[in-house]
Amino acid sequence: MRLHRRGLVAGLAGVLLLAPTARANTPEAAAAFIESRGTALKEVLDSDTPLAEKRERMAEILREAVDVRGVAQFVLGRHWRTASEAERAEYLRLFEATLIRNLSARFGELRGLRFTVSRSQPRGEEGVLVTTMVEQPGQAPVQLDWLVSFASGRPLIVDLVAEGTSLRITQRSEYSAVIQRGGGRVGALLDAMRQQLSALEQRELAQK
């Protein structure tokens, strides 16, 4: 099942984080936030730290600076309102775990990654869109646009746009389709997410 279309995009969505707090909602602050995360990303990916420690470091970064709950709720859409408390809790757990494993399962592929900020543009109440070029050894550069929100008083990544396509909107459509195929049950999505997480865990183990 295709819950995430691009491994690189899905992994990076939870990585470029944990910049020094920037209170000003400006393109410059957002660009500095993303640029600092490019440096932090390379340090972790290019290190010889054991895989489990790398994963934990990325998990800490993710929890501190991405609006995981906000993005997760957006992706689930109207189904968030109909989900039970237990389903919501399990969904949030699986959503975060999948973000982390999407990256850790690809640590080897991402080693040697190059990351450059090219511009930043205000997007009104949404925040600031920061454009970057990401290069992997032996592959053509990929343009990724990061939507940074300052609504909480500090920068938080709330979306990633690749080739004009919003990751959170794409995920929302895919998750909704899974629920529809499952008879409208959020539980059907949770089952699919567990399967995906298990596959990512196996892929991570194969790197060792």
Task: Tell me what each language-model feature is.
Residues 80, 97-98, 122-123, 136, ...:
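Solvent-exposed loop/turn segments at secondary-structure junctions
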Residues 3-9:
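N-terminal export leaders
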Residues 11-17:
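Bacterial N-terminal signal peptides
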Residues 100-142, 200-208:
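Surface-exposed, charged secondary-structure patches
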Residues 141-169:
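Short beta-strand edge/turn micro-motifs at domain boundaries
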